[in-house]
Swiss-Prot record:
The species this protein was found in: Arabidopsis thaliana (Mouse-ear cress)
Family: Belongs to the carbohydrate kinase PfkB family.
Enzyme Commission code: 2.7.1.4
Name the record gives this protein: Probable fructokinase-7
Keyword ATP-binding in annotation: yes
């Protein structure tokens, strides 16, 4: 890799986004997940681990590209073997990585993740600090952000400065350029100093988003324990006046949707699950890919329901394989699953 790439200028890895009219730009963390070679064990019991690329915003960028859409990733990794590997993975998956930066002094973040015997995921993170937390405003590719039809982000970048301020600036640039702002909080409590800090920061940017995707667990957490299935709870505590779409993912059961005009539920697509990692990110990819092509579906309930069924199918396919990025589906795979479901 040349001097340019190491200094943080990734022009030699840039690919042409296939259609800047439908570009989805994802901002945030990309890291290495270490996953046990056997399932159903604690991290301490795992006999060995295999490495896999991770980080929700990066997963979404790959998911959009895998579906034939146009996507880019903005974030920071370490100037190390893992960081360069992640940049290459994006490039190989046709994601524009010209907004990636490398840090000389901090390492690429690592996460050890296991699915325990009781079905709960267990996380152990190494970020003290990691490169993704150190992205500076001066390192933002403002031109790339301004091209975004949709600007997508999470909450993990809000945990530490300077990345927190950088994310807020990036959101402002995108909003001023007319981008649709998409927010998936992707709650990871072990990363936050306290539950209170997580709740406060996640909600601090809530009213800026046009589209929000949350899980049932996140509703319970953000509302302080309220019933996640109660429409009144969602509408009174989490729906804000500027919001165009709020989606609640319900795993294998599908999703609920809320807009200014209508609300409803779209059932899940039944498959045999192997690994749920990345299912939510695949769902978001499917939804954002549809939105990038046609924003009018936010006002058309029939089209929105079709887009959400498509997103449900994206999530379903992803759980049938191990890992997030390797399992992200192609357009053909989603169409085949939907056809077989209908027949």
């Amino acid at each position: 890799m040349g001097e340019d790439a190491i200094s943080g200028n990734l022009k030699n890895l840039t690919i042409d986004t296939r259609d800047s009219e439908t570009l989805v730009v994802c901002f945030g963390e990309m890291l290495i997940d270490f996953v046990p070679t056997v399932g159903g064990v604690s991290l301490a019991e795992a006999p060995a681990f295999k490495k896999a690329p991770g980080g929700a915003p990066a997963n979404v960028a790959v998911g959009v590209s895998r579906l034939g859409g146009s996507s880019a990733f903005i974030g920071k990794v370490g100037d190390d073997e893992f960081g360069r590997m992640l940049a290459d993975i994006l490039r190989l998956n046709n994601v524009d990585n010209s907004g990636m930066r490398f840090d000389h002094n901090a390492r690429t973040a690592l996460a050890f993740v296991t699915l325990r015997g009781d079905g709960e995921r267990e996380f152990l993170f190494f970020r003290h600090p990691s490169a993704d937390m150190l992205l500076l405003e001066s390192e933002l590719d403002k031109n790339l952000i301004q091209k975004a039809k949709i600007f997508h982000y999470g909450s993990i970048s809000l945990i530490e400065e300077p990345c927190r301020s950088t994310q807020l600036v990036a959101m402002k640039i995108a909003k001023a350029a007319g981008s649709l702002l998409s927010y998936d909080p992707n709650l990871r409590l072990p990363l936050w100093p306290s539950e209170e800090a997580a709740r406060k920061e996640i909600m601090s940017i809530w009213n800026l988003a046009d589209v929000i995707k949350i899980s049932e667990d996140e509703i319970t957490f953000l509302t302080g324990g309220d019933d996640p299935y109660d429409d009144d709870v969602v509408l009174q505590k989490l729906f804000h006046p500027n919001l165009k779409l709020l989606v609640v993912s319900e795993g294998p059961n599908g999703c609920r949707y809320y807009t200014q005009e209508f609300k409803g539920r779209v059932g899940g697509v039944k498959v045999k699950p192997v690994d749920t990692t990345g299912a939510g990110d695949a769902f978001v990819s499917g939804l954002l890919n549809s939105l990038a092509s046609d924003l009018t579906l936010l006002k058309d309930e029939k089209k929105l329901r079709e887009a959400l069924l498509f997103a449900n199918a994206c999530g379903a396919i992803t759980v049938t394989e191990r890992g997030a990025i390797p399992a992200m589906p192609s357009m053909d795979a989603v169409q085949d699953l939907l056809s077989s479901t209908r027949s």
